[in-house]
Amino acid sequence: MPFGCVTLGDKKNYNQPSEVTDRYDLGQVVKTEEFCEIFRAKDKTTGKLHTCKKFQKRDGRKVRKAAKNEIGILKMVKHPNILQLVDVFVTRKEYFIFLELATGREVFDWILDQGYYSERDTSNVVRQVLEAVAYLHSLKIVHRNLKLENLVYYNRLKNSKIVISDFHLAKLENGLIKEPCGTPEYLAPEVVGRQRYGRPVDCWAIGVIMYILLSGNPPFYEEVEEDDYENHDKNLFRKILAGDYEFDSPYWDDISQAAKDLVTRLMEVEQDQRITAEEAISHEWISGNAASDKNIKDGVCAQIEKNFARAKWKKAVRVTTLMKRLRAPEQSGTAATSDAATPGAAGGAVAAAAGGAAPASGASATVGTGGDAGCAAKSDDMASADRSATPATDGSATPATDGSVTPATDGSITPATDGSVTPATDRSATPATDGRATPATEESTVPAAQSSAAPAAKAAATPEPAVAQPDSTALEGATGQAPPSSKGEEATGCAQESQRVETS
């Protein structure tokens, strides 16, 4: 049955598990991600191989939301540089999403294997990403989690195309978005500054990707003591907010001025002045002959191995501490903020990041209930099973393996496994199959285009001092309106503002 059962509004209309196994052979699990298990599946009729993502409904609302969101977005898109949806089955217990199988390598691996690597190679990669993103933006879709890990080669042929994957955070821009999500090192200033944002955040992320591909260094990374995550976090967000990066020597000595110009325009701090994906495609470094043919492999590969082989920057980023600092001006007891975006919010956040509230003590994973991001400190050897990212079934926040942030079912933002920051479960707008935002039910295909106040988290095992109640604009939905909240919810949110998940 093509696309299985996708009319999830009728709760009684489910696929039987046998429908999946009658059509596909599911092999062993090849990868376990935050929300799902990934299989390599074979179509019994055609013999063609696909990727299958299996989401367990029992793993919680955030898992169900991620599955429904990915289905809704992927059904809207068809582009050669986007991994395409093949089939969908929804049983009473599971979602099965079948996608094209990309057999190529990640971009980093491809670069390391090349005998010759130049700006022109980078230009080819960035052009394909820009074309896919320009297409998404034409549909008013914001990916919100563009990063190198989500870019893969479709196959292992020499001229293989690049494809973008992982759409569980993508969102229709039915108005400016406020909820923070993404991967910390790729976050745009307006996301860090808790301002409303939209499609320009994807262009910023492409600028970060381009910077890394040309130098082997992330733009906002610096050496810190092994466990000094507090200073790393503070400096990371402060630099992002200020746009404080450099084309430092010797890494950029051989890079063309045209390449630097495009990076600068993609990483413009003011989102309304940032170049669009469509405009970037016409830039001389992409469409012209401005990209150099000089071999830069040795320098780039040396920095890639130094910065990324250790995976240090993918590790825990103490987002809760940073977000509390960044929100300090909003919580200082001044007049409550209105629904409109606050001018100068980024500047206030810079000041807060530089000398704001003290961080939570210890290397603990902390979850906030008012929209603050959850954090998890992680040392080099913390890949053990007891820090796994298995979603909790009781609605509680579950710590992850790399300290990044993913959605909880209680309105907080909790640690994830893929380095991404995902919003709380707010029933935000997700596209229906015909492109309309439709009301959500627990089993429906798409969440409704509204924001609601998330229920407070469970009582914390180790309570921390409460902080000021976040303002009503902290987790707005795609409509740009503040989420409604009752006095009871506010009181509960204040009383249970944070919880200690794990102490190292």
Curated annotation (Swiss-Prot):
Its cofactor is Ca(2+). Residues 445-470 have a biased composition (Low complexity). One of its GO terms (biological process) is modulation of chemical synaptic transmission. It is found in: Cell membrane; Cytoplasmic vesicle membrane. Residues 390-431 have a biased composition (Polar residues). It comes from the Eukaryota. GO terms for molecular function: ATP binding; calcium/calmodulin-dependent protein kinase activity; calmodulin binding. Its main location: membrane. InterPro entries: Kinase-like_dom_sf, Prot_kinase_dom. The modification Phosphothreonine is found at T438, T462. GO terms for cellular component: cytoplasm; cytoplasmic vesicle membrane; glutamatergic synapse; plasma membrane; postsynapse; synapse. Pfam families: Pkinase. Residues 24-286 form the Protein kinase domain. Signal peptide: none annotated. Residues 378-504 are annotated as: Disordered. Expressed in brain and weakly in eye. Not detected in liver, kidney, spleen, thymus, bladder, aorta, lung, intestine, esophagus, stomach, skeletal muscle, heart, diaphragm, uterus, tail skin, submaxillary gland, prostate, ear, epididymis, placenta, pancreas, ovary, testis, adrenal gland, parathyroid gland, thyroid gland, pineal gland, pituitary and sciatic nerve. In adult hippocampus, predominantly expressed in caudate nucleus, cortex, hypothalamus, olfactory bulb, and midbrain and faintly in pons, brainstem and spinal cord. The modification Phosphoserine is found at S384. Belongs to the protein kinase superfamily. CAMK Ser/Thr protein kinase family. Has no detectable kinase activity in vitro. The protein kinase domain is predicted to be catalytically inactive. Interacts with calmodulin, in the presence of calcium. This is CaM kinase-like vesicle-associated protein.
